[in-house]
UniProtKB/Swiss-Prot annotation:
Transmembrane segments: 330-350, 409-429
Pfam families, sorted: SseC (PF04888), T3SSipB (PF16535)
Principal localisation: secreted
GO biological process: killing of cells of another organism; protein localization to Golgi apparatus
Protein name (record): SPI-1 type 3 secretion system translocon protein SctE
Lineage: Bacteria, Pseudomonadati, Pseudomonadota, Gammaproteobacteria, Enterobacterales
Keywords: Coiled coil, Host membrane, Membrane, Secreted, Transmembrane, Transmembrane helix, Virulence
Compartments where located: Secreted; Host membrane
Activity regulation, short description: Secretion is regulated by the gatekeeper InvE/SctW.
Length: 593
Protein backbone atom coordinates (compact mmCIF):
# COMPACT_ATOMS: atom_id res chain seq x y z
CA UNK A 1 0.00 0.00 0.00
CA UNK A 2 2.86 2.35 0.85
CA UNK A 3 4.49 1.63 -2.48
CA UNK A 4 1.22 2.29 -4.23
CA UNK A 5 0.86 5.53 -2.35
CA UNK A 6 4.39 6.53 -3.25
CA UNK A 7 3.73 5.77 -6.88
CA UNK A 8 0.53 7.76 -6.75
CA UNK A 9 2.37 10.65 -5.09
CA UNK A 10 5.18 10.61 -7.63
CA UNK A 11 2.77 10.30 -10.52
CA UNK A 12 0.74 13.17 -9.10
CA UNK A 13 3.80 15.44 -8.93
CA UNK A 14 4.82 14.39 -12.40
CA UNK A 15 1.45 14.69 -14.08
CA UNK A 16 0.26 17.75 -12.17
CA UNK A 17 3.04 20.33 -11.66
CA UNK A 18 0.70 22.45 -9.54
CA UNK A 19 1.37 20.09 -6.65
CA UNK A 20 5.09 20.86 -6.70
CA UNK A 21 4.45 24.54 -7.30
CA UNK A 22 2.07 24.73 -4.34
CA UNK A 23 4.57 23.00 -2.04
CA UNK A 24 7.72 24.81 -3.15
CA UNK A 25 6.09 28.23 -3.22
CA UNK A 26 5.09 27.86 0.42
CA UNK A 27 8.59 26.80 1.40
CA UNK A 28 10.22 29.74 -0.39
CA UNK A 29 7.94 32.42 1.00
CA UNK A 30 8.02 31.44 4.70
CA UNK A 31 10.80 31.20 7.22
CA UNK A 32 8.86 28.88 9.54
CA UNK A 33 9.34 25.60 7.70
CA UNK A 34 6.95 23.59 9.93
CA UNK A 35 4.05 25.88 9.17
CA UNK A 36 5.02 25.86 5.53
CA UNK A 37 5.02 22.07 5.51
CA UNK A 38 1.60 21.91 7.18
CA UNK A 39 0.13 24.37 4.73
CA UNK A 40 1.75 22.56 1.83
CA UNK A 41 0.25 19.25 3.01
CA UNK A 42 -3.20 20.78 3.19
CA UNK A 43 -2.80 22.26 -0.28
CA UNK A 44 -1.70 18.90 -1.67
CA UNK A 45 -4.62 17.05 -0.08
CA UNK A 46 -7.07 19.66 -1.30
CA UNK A 47 -5.68 19.56 -4.81
CA UNK A 48 -5.75 15.75 -4.93
CA UNK A 49 -9.28 15.60 -3.58
CA UNK A 50 -10.39 18.14 -6.15
CA UNK A 51 -8.98 16.00 -8.94
CA UNK A 52 -10.88 12.93 -7.74
CA UNK A 53 -14.21 14.71 -7.55
CA UNK A 54 -15.89 15.14 -10.86
CA UNK A 55 -17.40 18.54 -10.27
CA UNK A 56 -14.39 20.22 -8.65
CA UNK A 57 -12.21 22.66 -10.57
CA UNK A 58 -8.51 22.04 -10.71
CA UNK A 59 -7.75 25.63 -9.76
CA UNK A 60 -9.09 25.21 -6.18
CA UNK A 61 -6.08 24.96 -3.90
CA UNK A 62 -7.49 25.26 -0.36
CA UNK A 63 -10.33 23.52 1.64
CA UNK A 64 -11.61 23.72 5.15
CA UNK A 65 -10.92 20.46 6.99
CA UNK A 66 -13.06 19.13 9.84
CA UNK A 67 -11.75 16.77 12.51
CA UNK A 68 -13.49 13.34 12.14
CA UNK A 69 -13.27 10.23 14.32
CA UNK A 70 -12.50 6.94 12.64
CA UNK A 71 -15.56 4.58 12.40
CA UNK A 72 -15.97 1.79 14.96
CA UNK A 73 -15.86 -1.93 14.08
CA UNK A 74 -19.64 -2.18 14.37
CA UNK A 75 -20.02 0.73 12.10
CA UNK A 76 -17.57 -0.83 9.63
CA UNK A 77 -19.63 -3.98 9.47
CA UNK A 78 -22.74 -1.95 8.80
CA UNK A 79 -21.03 0.10 6.06
CA UNK A 80 -22.38 -0.21 2.63
CA UNK A 81 -20.24 -0.48 -0.41
CA UNK A 82 -20.19 3.29 -0.74
CA UNK A 83 -19.08 3.65 2.86
CA UNK A 84 -16.32 1.13 2.46
CA UNK A 85 -15.10 3.02 -0.60
CA UNK A 86 -15.07 6.23 1.38
CA UNK A 87 -13.10 4.56 4.19
CA UNK A 88 -10.57 3.26 1.70
CA UNK A 89 -10.12 6.67 0.19
CA UNK A 90 -9.56 8.16 3.65
CA UNK A 91 -6.81 5.69 4.46
CA UNK A 92 -5.27 6.39 1.07
CA UNK A 93 -5.18 10.11 1.74
CA UNK A 94 -3.65 9.49 5.18
CA UNK A 95 -0.84 7.48 3.65
CA UNK A 96 -0.37 10.12 0.96
CA UNK A 97 -0.06 12.79 3.65
CA UNK A 98 2.54 10.75 5.57
CA UNK A 99 4.66 10.44 2.42
CA UNK A 100 4.43 14.18 1.68
CA UNK A 101 5.44 15.04 5.26
CA UNK A 102 8.52 12.82 5.05
CA UNK A 103 9.58 14.47 1.82
CA UNK A 104 9.08 17.91 3.31
CA UNK A 105 11.11 16.93 6.38
CA UNK A 106 13.97 15.79 4.20
CA UNK A 107 13.87 18.99 2.22
CA UNK A 108 13.76 20.96 5.45
CA UNK A 109 16.92 19.22 6.60
CA UNK A 110 18.58 20.11 3.34
CA UNK A 111 17.60 23.73 3.70
CA UNK A 112 18.86 23.83 7.27
CA UNK A 113 22.18 22.39 6.11
CA UNK A 114 22.35 24.98 3.35
CA UNK A 115 21.63 27.76 5.83
CA UNK A 116 24.38 26.55 8.15
CA UNK A 117 26.76 26.35 5.22
CA UNK A 118 25.85 29.85 4.09
CA UNK A 119 26.32 31.08 7.64
CA UNK A 120 29.83 29.65 7.81
CA UNK A 121 30.57 30.99 4.36
CA UNK A 122 29.20 34.39 5.34
CA UNK A 123 31.45 34.56 8.37
CA UNK A 124 34.46 33.60 6.27
CA UNK A 125 33.55 36.07 3.55
CA UNK A 126 33.04 38.73 6.20
CA UNK A 127 36.59 38.22 7.42
CA UNK A 128 37.87 38.42 3.85
CA UNK A 129 35.84 41.56 3.29
CA UNK A 130 37.22 43.23 6.40
CA UNK A 131 40.75 42.38 5.26
CA UNK A 132 40.08 43.67 1.74
CA UNK A 133 38.42 46.76 3.16
CA UNK A 134 41.50 47.50 5.28
CA UNK A 135 43.75 47.07 2.25
CA UNK A 136 41.50 49.36 0.21
CA UNK A 137 41.64 51.94 2.99
CA UNK A 138 45.45 51.81 3.08
CA UNK A 139 45.65 52.02 -0.72
CA UNK A 140 43.28 54.99 -0.71
CA UNK A 141 45.37 56.78 1.93
CA UNK A 142 48.49 56.10 -0.10
CA UNK A 143 46.75 57.44 -3.19
CA UNK A 144 45.79 60.61 -1.33
CA UNK A 145 49.37 61.07 -0.10
CA UNK A 146 50.65 60.54 -3.66
CA UNK A 147 48.31 63.26 -4.92
CA UNK A 148 49.66 65.66 -2.30
CA UNK A 149 53.23 64.82 -3.32
CA UNK A 150 52.31 65.38 -6.95
CA UNK A 151 50.82 68.75 -6.10
CA UNK A 152 53.98 69.72 -4.20
CA UNK A 153 56.22 68.56 -7.06
CA UNK A 154 54.08 70.55 -9.48
CA UNK A 155 54.48 73.70 -7.38
CA UNK A 156 58.26 73.21 -7.34
CA UNK A 157 58.28 72.66 -11.11
CA UNK A 158 56.18 75.79 -11.72
CA UNK A 159 58.57 77.85 -9.60
CA UNK A 160 61.62 76.41 -11.42
CA UNK A 161 60.02 77.08 -14.81
CA UNK A 162 59.20 80.64 -13.83
CA UNK A 163 62.78 81.17 -12.63
CA UNK A 164 64.13 79.76 -15.91
CA UNK A 165 61.89 82.05 -17.96
CA UNK A 166 63.03 85.10 -15.98
CA UNK A 167 66.69 84.12 -16.37
CA UNK A 168 66.26 83.62 -20.12
CA UNK A 169 64.49 86.96 -20.52
CA UNK A 170 67.32 88.65 -18.63
CA UNK A 171 69.90 86.90 -20.84
CA UNK A 172 68.04 87.94 -24.00
CA UNK A 173 68.07 91.56 -22.88
CA UNK A 174 71.88 91.57 -22.47
CA UNK A 175 74.53 91.84 -25.15
CA UNK A 176 77.36 89.26 -25.21
CA UNK A 177 79.78 92.10 -24.59
CA UNK A 178 78.04 93.22 -21.37
CA UNK A 179 79.84 92.47 -18.06
CA UNK A 180 76.92 90.53 -16.59
CA UNK A 181 76.31 88.36 -19.66
CA UNK A 182 78.40 85.40 -18.37
CA UNK A 183 76.70 85.53 -14.97
CA UNK A 184 73.26 85.65 -16.64
CA UNK A 185 74.21 82.73 -18.87
CA UNK A 186 75.31 80.71 -15.81
CA UNK A 187 72.03 81.59 -14.10
CA UNK A 188 70.11 80.31 -17.14
CA UNK A 189 72.08 77.07 -17.09
CA UNK A 190 71.47 76.58 -13.33
CA UNK A 191 67.76 77.40 -13.69
CA UNK A 192 67.48 74.96 -16.59
CA UNK A 193 69.10 72.25 -14.49
CA UNK A 194 66.70 72.92 -11.61
CA UNK A 195 63.73 72.91 -13.99
CA UNK A 196 64.85 69.57 -15.45
CA UNK A 197 65.22 68.03 -11.98
CA UNK A 198 61.82 69.40 -10.95
CA UNK A 199 60.28 67.98 -14.14
CA UNK A 200 61.77 64.55 -13.42
CA UNK A 201 60.48 64.68 -9.84
CA UNK A 202 57.03 65.68 -11.10
CA UNK A 203 57.01 62.84 -13.62
CA UNK A 204 58.01 60.34 -10.93
CA UNK A 205 55.34 61.65 -8.56
CA UNK A 206 52.73 61.51 -11.33
CA UNK A 207 53.67 57.92 -12.19
CA UNK A 208 53.53 56.95 -8.52
CA UNK A 209 50.12 58.60 -8.21
CA UNK A 210 48.80 56.76 -11.25
CA UNK A 211 50.06 53.45 -9.87
CA UNK A 212 48.59 54.21 -6.42
CA UNK A 213 45.26 55.12 -8.01
CA UNK A 214 45.21 51.91 -10.03
CA UNK A 215 46.05 49.88 -6.91
CA UNK A 216 43.37 51.65 -4.86
CA UNK A 217 40.78 51.07 -7.59
CA UNK A 218 41.70 47.38 -7.83
CA UNK A 219 41.46 46.88 -4.07
CA UNK A 220 38.16 48.77 -3.91
CA UNK A 221 36.79 46.52 -6.67
CA UNK A 222 38.03 43.50 -4.73
CA UNK A 223 36.11 44.68 -1.68
CA UNK A 224 33.03 45.18 -3.86
CA UNK A 225 33.31 41.64 -5.23
CA UNK A 226 33.61 40.21 -1.73
CA UNK A 227 30.62 42.27 -0.67
CA UNK A 228 28.58 40.74 -3.48
CA UNK A 229 29.20 37.28 -2.01
CA UNK A 230 27.73 38.50 1.25
CA UNK A 231 24.26 38.82 -0.23
CA UNK A 232 23.44 35.06 0.02
CA UNK A 233 23.73 34.72 3.83
CA UNK A 234 20.62 34.51 6.06
CA UNK A 235 22.25 34.94 9.43
CA UNK A 236 21.14 38.06 11.25
CA UNK A 237 24.61 38.84 12.58
CA UNK A 238 26.05 38.36 9.14
CA UNK A 239 23.40 40.64 7.70
CA UNK A 240 24.40 43.33 10.19
CA UNK A 241 28.03 42.93 9.20
CA UNK A 242 27.04 43.13 5.54
CA UNK A 243 25.04 46.30 6.15
CA UNK A 244 27.95 47.92 7.97
CA UNK A 245 30.31 46.76 5.23
CA UNK A 246 28.02 48.26 2.60
CA UNK A 247 28.08 51.60 4.35
CA UNK A 248 31.87 51.53 4.74
CA UNK A 249 32.33 50.42 1.16
CA UNK A 250 30.02 53.10 -0.18
CA UNK A 251 31.89 55.78 1.76
CA UNK A 252 35.23 54.44 0.51
CA UNK A 253 34.02 54.37 -3.09
CA UNK A 254 32.81 57.94 -2.77
CA UNK A 255 36.14 58.96 -1.27
CA UNK A 256 38.04 57.15 -4.01
CA UNK A 257 35.91 58.88 -6.64
CA UNK A 258 36.64 62.26 -5.05
CA UNK A 259 40.38 61.57 -4.98
CA UNK A 260 40.35 60.46 -8.62
CA UNK A 261 38.51 63.66 -9.55
CA UNK A 262 41.11 65.71 -7.65
CA UNK A 263 43.93 63.89 -9.41
CA UNK A 264 42.31 64.45 -12.81
CA UNK A 265 41.99 68.15 -12.00
CA UNK A 266 45.66 68.35 -10.97
CA UNK A 267 46.82 66.51 -14.10
CA UNK A 268 44.69 68.72 -16.35
CA UNK A 269 45.87 71.89 -14.64
CA UNK A 270 49.49 70.74 -14.80
CA UNK A 271 49.16 69.96 -18.50
CA UNK A 272 47.62 73.34 -19.27
CA UNK A 273 50.16 75.29 -17.22
CA UNK A 274 53.01 73.30 -18.74
CA UNK A 275 51.78 74.21 -22.22
CA UNK A 276 51.45 77.87 -21.20
CA UNK A 277 54.99 77.89 -19.77
CA UNK A 278 56.34 76.29 -22.93
CA UNK A 279 54.52 78.86 -25.06
CA UNK A 280 55.90 81.72 -22.95
CA UNK A 281 59.41 80.29 -23.17
CA UNK A 282 59.18 79.78 -26.94
CA UNK A 283 57.79 83.29 -27.40
CA UNK A 284 60.73 84.73 -25.44
CA UNK A 285 63.20 82.71 -27.50
CA UNK A 286 61.44 83.71 -30.70
CA UNK A 287 61.53 87.40 -29.79
CA UNK A 288 65.23 87.14 -28.95
CA UNK A 289 66.00 85.42 -32.23
CA UNK A 290 63.90 87.94 -34.13
CA UNK A 291 65.83 90.82 -32.55
CA UNK A 292 69.09 89.09 -33.41
CA UNK A 293 67.93 88.59 -37.00
CA UNK A 294 67.05 92.28 -37.29
CA UNK A 295 70.45 93.23 -35.87
CA UNK A 296 72.32 90.92 -38.25
CA UNK A 297 70.25 92.17 -41.18
CA UNK A 298 71.21 95.75 -40.35
CA UNK A 299 74.87 94.71 -40.05
CA UNK A 300 74.69 92.95 -43.42
CA UNK A 301 73.20 96.02 -45.09
CA UNK A 302 75.78 98.28 -43.45
CA UNK A 303 78.74 96.12 -44.52
CA UNK A 304 77.33 95.86 -48.04
CA UNK A 305 76.99 99.64 -48.17
CA UNK A 306 80.58 100.06 -46.97
CA UNK A 307 81.82 97.68 -49.66
CA UNK A 308 79.92 99.63 -52.32
CA UNK A 309 81.30 102.93 -51.02
CA UNK A 310 84.83 101.55 -51.01
CA UNK A 311 84.39 100.29 -54.56
CA UNK A 312 83.06 103.68 -55.65
CA UNK A 313 85.91 105.52 -53.91
CA UNK A 314 88.54 103.28 -55.46
CA UNK A 315 86.89 103.81 -58.84
CA UNK A 316 87.17 107.56 -58.43
CA UNK A 317 90.80 107.26 -57.37
CA UNK A 318 91.47 105.02 -60.35
CA UNK A 319 89.91 107.61 -62.64
CA UNK A 320 92.03 110.38 -61.14
CA UNK A 321 95.26 108.39 -61.39
CA UNK A 322 94.27 107.16 -64.85
CA UNK A 323 93.84 110.73 -65.99
CA UNK A 324 97.19 111.73 -64.52
CA UNK A 325 98.79 108.66 -66.05
CA UNK A 326 97.34 109.51 -69.44
CA UNK A 327 98.56 113.09 -69.21
CA UNK A 328 102.08 112.02 -68.30
CA UNK A 329 102.12 109.35 -71.00
CA UNK A 330 100.98 111.77 -73.68
CA UNK A 331 103.55 114.33 -72.59
CA UNK A 332 106.24 111.65 -72.67
CA UNK A 333 105.10 110.60 -76.11
CA UNK A 334 105.78 114.10 -77.39
CA UNK A 335 109.38 113.95 -76.18
CA UNK A 336 110.12 110.34 -77.10
CA UNK A 337 108.53 110.35 -80.48
CA UNK A 338 105.86 107.73 -79.67
CA UNK A 339 107.85 105.27 -77.53
CA UNK A 340 105.40 105.63 -74.63
CA UNK A 341 102.24 105.63 -76.72
CA UNK A 342 101.55 102.07 -75.58
CA UNK A 343 101.43 103.32 -72.00
CA UNK A 344 99.33 106.30 -73.04
CA UNK A 345 96.79 104.09 -74.80
CA UNK A 346 95.34 103.09 -71.41
CA UNK A 347 94.01 106.57 -70.69
CA UNK A 348 93.86 107.97 -74.17
CA UNK A 349 90.20 107.29 -74.65
CA UNK A 350 89.31 109.29 -71.55
CA UNK A 351 91.49 112.20 -72.57
CA UNK A 352 90.21 112.19 -76.16
CA UNK A 353 86.66 112.15 -74.91
CA UNK A 354 87.48 115.03 -72.60
CA UNK A 355 88.99 117.04 -75.47
CA UNK A 356 86.01 116.28 -77.68
CA UNK A 357 83.65 117.40 -74.96
CA UNK A 358 85.75 120.49 -74.36
CA UNK A 359 85.81 121.31 -78.07
CA UNK A 360 82.09 120.79 -78.36
CA UNK A 361 80.91 122.49 -75.20
CA UNK A 362 83.92 124.43 -74.01
CA UNK A 363 83.93 122.59 -70.67
CA UNK A 364 86.25 119.72 -69.65
CA UNK A 365 84.44 117.19 -67.41
CA UNK A 366 87.74 115.83 -66.09
CA UNK A 367 88.84 119.34 -65.17
CA UNK A 368 85.49 120.05 -63.52
CA UNK A 369 85.67 116.79 -61.53
CA UNK A 370 89.29 117.22 -60.47
CA UNK A 371 89.24 120.95 -59.72
CA UNK A 372 88.14 120.64 -56.05
CA UNK A 373 90.70 117.93 -55.35
CA UNK A 374 93.47 119.67 -57.27
CA UNK A 375 92.77 123.07 -55.71
CA UNK A 376 92.24 122.04 -52.10
CA UNK A 377 94.12 118.76 -51.67
CA UNK A 378 96.61 117.70 -54.32
CA UNK A 379 97.91 121.14 -55.34
CA UNK A 380 98.85 122.29 -51.81
CA UNK A 381 100.33 118.87 -51.08
CA UNK A 382 102.33 118.84 -54.33
CA UNK A 383 103.62 122.38 -53.70
CA UNK A 384 104.67 121.55 -50.16
CA UNK A 385 106.49 118.35 -51.13
CA UNK A 386 107.95 119.94 -54.29
CA UNK A 387 109.40 122.90 -52.36
CA UNK A 388 110.95 120.58 -49.81
CA UNK A 389 112.58 118.41 -52.48
CA UNK A 390 113.72 121.49 -54.46
CA UNK A 391 115.45 122.93 -51.42
CA UNK A 392 117.11 119.59 -50.73
CA UNK A 393 118.39 119.31 -54.32
CA UNK A 394 119.64 122.90 -54.31
CA UNK A 395 121.50 122.14 -51.13
CA UNK A 396 123.22 119.28 -52.96
CA UNK A 397 124.36 121.61 -55.74
CA UNK A 398 121.71 121.00 -58.40
CA UNK A 399 120.74 124.02 -60.46
CA UNK A 400 117.46 125.75 -59.62
CA UNK A 401 115.45 124.84 -62.75
CA UNK A 402 116.41 121.17 -62.63
CA UNK A 403 115.69 121.04 -58.91
CA UNK A 404 112.28 122.70 -59.39
CA UNK A 405 111.37 120.28 -62.19
CA UNK A 406 112.44 117.23 -60.17
CA UNK A 407 110.67 118.57 -57.07
CA UNK A 408 107.44 119.11 -59.00
CA UNK A 409 107.54 115.59 -60.46
CA UNK A 410 108.36 113.86 -57.18
CA UNK A 411 105.87 116.05 -55.32
CA UNK A 412 103.10 115.01 -57.69
CA UNK A 413 103.96 111.31 -57.28
CA UNK A 414 104.24 111.45 -53.50
CA UNK A 415 101.05 113.49 -53.22
CA UNK A 416 99.17 110.95 -55.31
CA UNK A 417 100.52 108.05 -53.24
CA UNK A 418 99.72 109.85 -49.98
CA UNK A 419 96.22 110.62 -51.21
CA UNK A 420 95.66 106.98 -52.08
CA UNK A 421 97.00 105.81 -48.70
CA UNK A 422 94.85 108.31 -46.79
CA UNK A 423 91.71 107.31 -48.67
CA UNK A 424 92.39 103.58 -48.16
CA UNK A 425 93.05 104.03 -44.41
CA UNK A 426 89.99 106.20 -43.99
CA UNK A 427 87.90 103.67 -45.92
CA UNK A 428 89.00 100.82 -43.65
CA UNK A 429 89.16 102.60 -40.27
CA UNK A 430 87.46 105.94 -40.40
CA UNK A 431 84.56 104.96 -42.68
CA UNK A 432 82.70 108.30 -42.30
CA UNK A 433 85.30 110.45 -44.04
CA UNK A 434 85.73 107.89 -46.81
CA UNK A 435 82.03 107.79 -47.36
CA UNK A 436 81.86 111.59 -47.62
CA UNK A 437 84.82 111.74 -49.98
CA UNK A 438 83.48 108.92 -52.13
CA UNK A 439 80.04 110.49 -52.26
CA UNK A 440 81.50 113.87 -53.16
CA UNK A 441 83.71 112.48 -55.92
CA UNK A 442 81.04 110.23 -57.38
CA UNK A 443 78.47 113.04 -57.20
CA UNK A 444 80.75 115.52 -58.96
CA UNK A 445 81.73 113.04 -61.65
CA UNK A 446 78.17 111.85 -62.11
CA UNK A 447 76.64 115.33 -62.40
CA UNK A 448 79.32 116.55 -64.78
CA UNK A 449 79.08 113.53 -67.08
CA UNK A 450 75.26 113.57 -66.92
CA UNK A 451 75.21 117.17 -68.13
CA UNK A 452 77.84 116.77 -70.82
CA UNK A 453 77.06 113.36 -72.37
CA UNK A 454 74.08 114.52 -74.52
CA UNK A 455 76.12 117.36 -76.05
CA UNK A 456 79.06 115.01 -76.58
CA UNK A 457 76.97 112.52 -78.53
CA UNK A 458 75.37 115.25 -80.59
CA UNK A 459 78.63 116.96 -81.53
CA UNK A 460 80.38 113.64 -82.05
CA UNK A 461 77.80 112.57 -84.59
CA UNK A 462 78.19 115.79 -86.55
CA UNK A 463 81.95 116.36 -86.79
CA UNK A 464 83.79 113.74 -84.79
CA UNK A 465 86.94 113.51 -86.90
CA UNK A 466 87.39 117.27 -87.02
CA UNK A 467 87.08 117.59 -83.27
CA UNK A 468 89.50 114.72 -82.72
CA UNK A 469 92.11 116.37 -84.97
CA UNK A 470 91.67 119.74 -83.30
CA UNK A 471 91.92 118.15 -79.87
CA UNK A 472 95.17 116.39 -80.67
CA UNK A 473 96.61 119.54 -82.18
CA UNK A 474 95.67 121.50 -79.08
CA UNK A 475 97.27 118.89 -76.86
CA UNK A 476 100.52 118.92 -78.90
CA UNK A 477 100.71 122.68 -79.09
CA UNK A 478 99.84 123.01 -75.45
CA UNK A 479 102.56 120.64 -74.40
CA UNK A 480 105.07 122.48 -76.63
CA UNK A 481 104.15 125.77 -75.08
CA UNK A 482 104.50 124.33 -71.62
CA UNK A 483 107.97 123.01 -72.46
CA UNK A 484 109.07 126.34 -73.87
CA UNK A 485 107.75 128.21 -70.86
CA UNK A 486 109.61 125.87 -68.50
CA UNK A 487 112.85 126.57 -70.34
CA UNK A 488 113.36 123.05 -71.56
CA UNK A 489 115.66 122.53 -74.49
CA UNK A 490 114.15 121.22 -77.67
CA UNK A 491 117.04 119.22 -78.94
CA UNK A 492 116.81 115.42 -79.25
CA UNK A 493 118.87 114.65 -76.15
CA UNK A 494 116.79 116.89 -73.92
CA UNK A 495 113.58 115.49 -75.30
CA UNK A 496 114.76 111.96 -74.73
CA UNK A 497 115.82 112.80 -71.16
CA UNK A 498 112.49 114.40 -70.39
CA UNK A 499 110.63 111.53 -72.08
CA UNK A 500 112.47 108.91 -70.04
CA UNK A 501 111.76 110.83 -66.86
CA UNK A 502 108.09 111.12 -67.72
CA UNK A 503 107.97 107.41 -68.57
CA UNK A 504 109.32 106.62 -65.14
CA UNK A 505 106.77 108.93 -63.60
CA UNK A 506 104.03 107.22 -65.60
CA UNK A 507 105.31 103.82 -64.50
CA UNK A 508 105.31 104.93 -60.85
CA UNK A 509 101.80 106.30 -61.18
CA UNK A 510 100.66 103.06 -62.75
CA UNK A 511 102.15 101.13 -59.82
CA UNK A 512 100.43 103.55 -57.46
CA UNK A 513 97.13 103.07 -59.28
CA UNK A 514 97.52 99.29 -59.08
CA UNK A 515 98.35 99.49 -55.37
CA UNK A 516 95.37 101.74 -54.75
CA UNK A 517 93.02 99.42 -56.59
CA UNK A 518 94.50 96.42 -54.72
CA UNK A 519 94.07 98.16 -51.38
CA UNK A 520 90.52 99.04 -52.35
CA UNK A 521 89.89 95.43 -53.31
CA UNK A 522 91.25 94.26 -49.95
CA UNK A 523 89.09 96.75 -48.06
CA UNK A 524 86.07 95.76 -50.12
CA UNK A 525 86.85 92.09 -49.41
CA UNK A 526 86.95 92.83 -45.67
CA UNK A 527 83.54 94.45 -45.84
CA UNK A 528 82.16 91.59 -47.95
CA UNK A 529 83.56 89.11 -45.40
CA UNK A 530 81.85 90.97 -42.56
CA UNK A 531 78.63 91.03 -44.56
CA UNK A 532 78.92 87.28 -45.19
CA UNK A 533 79.41 86.63 -41.46
CA UNK A 534 76.35 88.75 -40.66
CA UNK A 535 74.38 86.82 -43.28
CA UNK A 536 75.56 83.51 -41.78
CA UNK A 537 74.44 84.64 -38.32
CA UNK A 538 71.12 85.66 -39.83
CA UNK A 539 70.65 82.22 -41.40
CA UNK A 540 71.61 80.56 -38.09
CA UNK A 541 69.01 82.64 -36.26
CA UNK A 542 66.46 81.69 -38.90
CA UNK A 543 67.28 78.01 -38.36
CA UNK A 544 66.82 78.55 -34.62
CA UNK A 545 63.39 80.05 -35.36
CA UNK A 546 62.48 76.91 -37.32
CA UNK A 547 63.69 74.76 -34.42
CA UNK A 548 61.57 76.78 -32.00
CA UNK A 549 58.55 76.17 -34.23
CA UNK A 550 59.31 72.44 -34.12
CA UNK A 551 59.56 72.53 -30.32
CA UNK A 552 56.24 74.35 -30.15
CA UNK A 553 54.65 71.64 -32.30
CA UNK A 554 56.07 68.95 -30.01
CA UNK A 555 54.69 70.76 -26.95
CA UNK A 556 51.23 70.78 -28.50
CA UNK A 557 51.52 67.06 -29.25
CA UNK A 558 52.58 66.37 -25.64
CA UNK A 559 49.60 68.40 -24.47
CA UNK A 560 47.35 66.19 -26.61
CA UNK A 561 48.87 63.03 -25.11
CA UNK A 562 48.34 64.39 -21.60
CA UNK A 563 44.74 65.16 -22.49
CA UNK A 564 44.33 61.53 -23.54
CA UNK A 565 45.65 60.44 -20.12
CA UNK A 566 43.13 62.74 -18.46
CA UNK A 567 40.35 61.27 -20.58
CA UNK A 568 41.40 57.74 -19.57
CA UNK A 569 41.33 58.74 -15.90
CA UNK A 570 37.87 60.23 -16.34
CA UNK A 571 36.75 57.04 -18.03
CA UNK A 572 38.11 54.96 -15.13
CA UNK A 573 36.35 57.21 -12.61
CA UNK A 574 33.09 56.95 -14.57
CA UNK A 575 33.45 53.16 -14.61
CA UNK A 576 33.97 53.10 -10.84
CA UNK A 577 30.89 55.28 -10.30
CA UNK A 578 28.88 53.05 -12.64
CA UNK A 579 29.94 49.93 -10.75
CA UNK A 580 29.02 51.61 -7.48
CA UNK A 581 25.58 52.50 -8.87
CA UNK A 582 25.06 48.93 -10.10
CA UNK A 583 25.97 47.54 -6.68
CA UNK A 584 23.59 49.99 -5.02
CA UNK A 585 20.74 48.98 -7.31
CA UNK A 586 21.45 45.30 -6.66
CA UNK A 587 21.37 45.87 -2.89
CA UNK A 588 18.13 47.82 -3.23
CA UNK A 589 16.48 45.02 -5.20
CA UNK A 590 17.59 42.42 -2.66
CA UNK A 591 16.30 44.47 0.25
CA UNK A 592 12.87 44.81 -1.42
CA UNK A 593 12.69 41.07 -2.15
Amino acid sequence: MVNDASSISRSGYTQNPRLAEAAFEGVRKNTDFLKAADKAFKDVVATKAGDLKAGTKSGESAINTVGLKPPTDAAREKLSSEGQLTLLLGKLMTLLGDVSLSQLESRLAVWQAMIESQKEMGIQVSKEFQTALGEAQEATDLYEASIKKTDTAKSVYDAATKKLTQAQNKLQSLDPADPGYAQAEAAVEQAGKEATEAKEALDKATDATVKAGTDAKAKAEKADNILTKFQGTANAASQNQVSQGEQDNLSNVARLTMLMAMFIEIVGKNTEESLQNDLALFNALQEGRQAEMEKKSAEFQEETRKAEETNRIMGCIGKVLGALLTIVSVVAAVFTGGASLALAAVGLAVMVADEIVKAATGVSFIQQALNPIMEHVLKPLMELIGKAITKALEGLGVDKKTAEMAGSIVGAIVAAIAMVAVIVVVAVVGKGAAAKLGNALSKMMGETIKKLVPNVLKQLAQNGSKLFTQGMQRITSGLGNVGSKMGLQTNALSKELVGNTLNKVALGMEVTNTAAQSAGGVAEGVFIKNASEALADFMLARFAMDQIQQWLKQSVEIFGENQKVTAELQKAMSSAVQQNADASRFILRQSRA
